């Protein structure tokens, strides 16, 4: 049996789409009624709640389980969607030990569900899927607070079948996202298969099962990671920087290693030099209370990992959410300042080279956003924490390439003076609180820009064309020659030079007509009258001759190397033949 004293509480992050029941789930676990006091029943602030093992065992309803679990409890991070998970970072990794992904079993997967899964996959974080709102399945008879296995047996066969159908829709979508999954009580190996727990956060059905699975995951896969140095200096992550009445700027911090004491010197990441300050007060949430309710705090002299704590200290205004916080002494201060500065610098980007600008609200979300754009091989000129400022807008407006005259903003505001400037500029701004939506929106914008650029090129470029002079269709022999032709490939346009298969340029298309009407161009399969200036029938050209539009070398390069994929099949074939004719004498033509 491991030493319980040096085993910290596992940190659990609750993720999922808005209104799918994250806060209600935590509310049920805590036995408080926070949701009812919040706007729109959506969690507004980052909070952390410590749920001791005794409370969990009580929920499970079997005191004999107490000896099976050695973790001291669970520390839940309560936050909108996946945001805290990215904020809770540790040198590029995830700080949360476990996660719950809440999905409405009736609505299925939504944008932030996919976002949560992508982030968890990236950080290899063990998690459980909670299929919530089973009480809304037609005909479901609720059995308050009972384990799922018990309440499921009390339902009719029709209702059981309906639940299984909805459950397997969730499991199927998880499979599509690259996860093997099964109903939790059918899983034989949680290392290979995700457990899906059907619950009703509203009635409490299935909640004991969620707690049981979380404790099991912590015990089985995390025990080695949960050992901490009780006597060592405190190490944590800033969740949020908050102004508090009577205290000024404070930090909500998750301490994940060591001990933090009142009076300790701490170093915290900021946009400039790391902040060095002394802890004036430590405010700890009481067990089973939310960090954000100040009246429920108690002042303490020290805290030990893992814990959510509010820190009051001078000079915290510039602290960054998502940045590290570490206790230092005289001997370690300089080293820790350098470490924290280098960690912030690793995430921030200021290359001055060509690329987009990224702004995010926390260091963790900036890191996640940069990762996603770099994965797509998007060049980034600048990436930093903070709202979109007037200076950012001016800087982006100096970029000529529309693909890079772009500001991406995750969970940030646009300053009013910046907004006024941007309305008059060509800078494109994308803001959202879903990372992959920002990536998708930018990809869509790039595609639109490329299509517009191609369209402009198509309008100005001479495209490949191949045609045959039809027998019995010589209407005029010269000045200009007027002949009937059939377009065999590509497109023929007025004012384009034409050549024979031997490479000789014989004249210029001066006009095209169909049934007496002048037309600017004719595509494959069309039979039209063509006026060719500079050619004489019987000398340079004759019936049955096959001719090609003589595409200029500069245009041929663009066609072959830049817009080839956008050409039609017959245009590609015509271009290929034309290039092979040109390269008989000069293999490097238009290369």
UniProtKB/Swiss-Prot annotation:
<dbReference type="Pfam" id="PF14578">
    <property type="entry name" value="GTP_EFTU_D4"/>
</dbReference>
<feature type="region of interest" description="G3">
    <location>
        <begin position="78"/>
        <end position="81"/>
    </location>
</feature>
<keyword id="KW-0396">Initiation factor</keyword>
<comment type="function">
    <text>Function in general translation initiation by promoting the binding of the formylmethionine-tRNA to ribosomes. Seems to function along with eIF-2.</text>
</comment>
<dbReference type="GO" id="GO:0005737">
    <property type="term" value="C:cytoplasm"/>
</dbReference>
<keyword id="KW-0648">Protein biosynthesis</keyword>
<dbReference type="InterPro" id="IPR000795">
    <property type="entry name" value="T_Tr_GTP-bd_dom"/>
</dbReference>
<feature type="binding site">
    <location>
        <begin position="132"/>
        <end position="135"/>
    </location>
    <ligand>
        <name>GTP</name>
    </ligand>
</feature>
<feature type="region of interest" description="G4">
    <location>
        <begin position="132"/>
        <end position="135"/>
    </location>
</feature>
<dbReference type="InterPro" id="IPR036925">
    <property type="entry name" value="TIF_IF2_dom3_sf"/>
</dbReference>
<keyword id="KW-0342">GTP-binding</keyword>
<comment type="similarity">
    <text>Belongs to the TRAFAC class translation factor GTPase superfamily. Classic translation factor GTPase family. IF-2 subfamily.</text>
</comment>
<feature type="binding site">
    <location>
        <begin position="16"/>
        <end position="23"/>
    </location>
    <ligand>
        <name>GTP</name>
    </ligand>
</feature>
<feature type="region of interest" description="G5">
    <location>
        <begin position="200"/>
        <end position="202"/>
    </location>
</feature>
<dbReference type="Pfam" id="PF03144">
    <property type="entry name" value="GTP_EFTU_D2"/>
</dbReference>
<dbReference type="InterPro" id="IPR009000">
    <property type="entry name" value="Transl_B-barrel_sf"/>
</dbReference>
<dbReference type="InterPro" id="IPR029459">
    <property type="entry name" value="EFTU-type"/>
</dbReference>
<dbReference type="InterPro" id="IPR027417">
    <property type="entry name" value="P-loop_NTPase"/>
</dbReference>
<dbReference type="Pfam" id="PF11987">
    <property type="entry name" value="IF-2"/>
</dbReference>
<feature type="domain" description="tr-type G">
    <location>
        <begin position="7"/>
        <end position="223"/>
    </location>
</feature>
<feature type="region of interest" description="G1">
    <location>
        <begin position="16"/>
        <end position="23"/>
    </location>
</feature>
<dbReference type="InterPro" id="IPR023115">
    <property type="entry name" value="TIF_IF2_dom3"/>
</dbReference>
<feature type="region of interest" description="G2">
    <location>
        <begin position="41"/>
        <end position="45"/>
    </location>
</feature>
<keyword id="KW-0547">Nucleotide-binding</keyword>
<dbReference type="InterPro" id="IPR005225">
    <property type="entry name" value="Small_GTP-bd"/>
</dbReference>
<protein>
    <recommendedName>
        <fullName>Probable translation initiation factor IF-2</fullName>
    </recommendedName>
</protein>
<dbReference type="GO" id="GO:0003924">
    <property type="term" value="F:GTPase activity"/>
</dbReference>
<dbReference type="GO" id="GO:0005525">
    <property type="term" value="F:GTP binding"/>
</dbReference>
<dbReference type="GO" id="GO:0003743">
    <property type="term" value="F:translation initiation factor activity"/>
</dbReference>
<dbReference type="InterPro" id="IPR015760">
    <property type="entry name" value="TIF_IF2"/>
</dbReference>
<dbReference type="InterPro" id="IPR004161">
    <property type="entry name" value="EFTu-like_2"/>
</dbReference>
<feature type="binding site">
    <location>
        <begin position="78"/>
        <end position="82"/>
    </location>
    <ligand>
        <name>GTP</name>
    </ligand>
</feature>
<dbReference type="Pfam" id="PF00009">
    <property type="entry name" value="GTP_EFTU"/>
</dbReference>
<dbReference type="InterPro" id="IPR004544">
    <property type="entry name" value="TF_aIF-2_arc"/>
</dbReference>
């Amino acid at each position: 049996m491991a030493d319980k004293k040096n085993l910290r509480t596992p940190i659990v992050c609750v993720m999922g789409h808005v209104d799918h029941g994250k806060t209600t789930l935590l509310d049920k676990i805590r036995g408080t009624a926070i949701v009812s006091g919040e706007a729109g029943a959506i969690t507004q602030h980052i909070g952390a709640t410590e749920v001791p093992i005794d409370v969990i065992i009580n929920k499970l309803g079997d005191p004999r389980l107490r000896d099976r679990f050695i973790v001291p409890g669970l520390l839940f991070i309560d936050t909108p969607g996946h945001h805290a998970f990215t904020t809770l970072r540790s040198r590029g990794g995830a700080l949360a030990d476990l996660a719950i992904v809440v999905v409405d079993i009736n609505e299925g997967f939504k944008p932030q569900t996919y976002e949560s899964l992508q982030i968890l996959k990236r950080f290899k974080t063990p998690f459980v899927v909670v299929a919530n709102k089973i009480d809304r399945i037609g005909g479901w008879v609720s059995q308050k607070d009972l384990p799922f296995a018990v309440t499921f047996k009390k339902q009719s066969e029709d209702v059981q079948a309906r639940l299984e159908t909805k459950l397997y829709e969730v499991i199927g979508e998880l499979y599509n996202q690259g996860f093997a999954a099964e109903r939790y009580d059918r899983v034989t190996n949680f290392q290979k298969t995700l457990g899906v727990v059907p619950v009703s956060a509203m009635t409490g059905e299935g909640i004991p099962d969620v707690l049981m699975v979380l404790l099991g995951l912590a015990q089985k896969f995390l025990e080695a990671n949960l050992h901490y140095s009780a006597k060592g200096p405190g190490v944590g992550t800033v969740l949020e920087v908050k102004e508090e009445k009577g205290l000024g700027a404070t930090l909500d911090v998750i301490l994940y290693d060591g001990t933090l004491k009142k009076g300790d010197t701490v170093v915290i990441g900021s946009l400039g030099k790391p902040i060095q300050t002394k802890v004036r007060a430590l405010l700890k949430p009481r067990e089973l209370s939310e960090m954000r309710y100040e009246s429920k705090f108690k002042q303490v002299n020290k805290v030990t990992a893992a814990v959510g704590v509010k820190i009051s200290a001078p000079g915290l205004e510039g602290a960054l959410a998502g940045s590290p916080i570490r206790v230092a002494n005289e001997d370690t201060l300089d080293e820790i300042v350098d470490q924290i500065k280098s960690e912030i610098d690793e995430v921030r980007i200021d290359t001055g080279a060509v690329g987009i600008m990224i702004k995010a609200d926390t260091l963790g979300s900036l890191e996640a956003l940069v990762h996603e754009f770099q994965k797509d091989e998007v060049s980034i000129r600048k990436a930093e924490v903070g709202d979109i400022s007037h200076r950012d807008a001016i800087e982006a407006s100096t970029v000529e390439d529309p693909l890079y005259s772009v500001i991406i903003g995750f969970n940030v505001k646009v300053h009013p003076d910046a907004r006024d400037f941007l309305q008059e500029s060509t800078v494109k701004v994308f803001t959202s609180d879903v990372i992959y939506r920002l990536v998708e929106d930018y990809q869509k914008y790039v595609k639109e820009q490329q299509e517009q650029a191609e369209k402009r090129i198509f309008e100005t470029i001479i495209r490949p064309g191949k045609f045959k002079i039809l027998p019995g269709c010589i209407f005029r022999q010269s000045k200009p020659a007027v002949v009937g032709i059939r377009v065999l490939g590509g497109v023929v346009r007025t004012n384009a030079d034409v050549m024979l298969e031997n490479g000789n340029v014989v004249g210029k298309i001066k006009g095209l007509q169909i049934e007496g009407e002048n037309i600017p161009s004719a595509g494959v399969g069309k039979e039209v009258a063509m006026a060719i200036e500079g050619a004489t029938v019987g000398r340079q050209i004759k019936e049955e001759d096959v001719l090609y539009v003589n595409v200029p070398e500069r245009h041929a390069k663009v066609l072959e190397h830049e817009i080839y994929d956008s050409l039609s099949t017959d245009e590609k074939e015509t271009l290929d033949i034309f290039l092979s004719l040109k390269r008989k004498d000069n293999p490097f033509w238009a290369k």
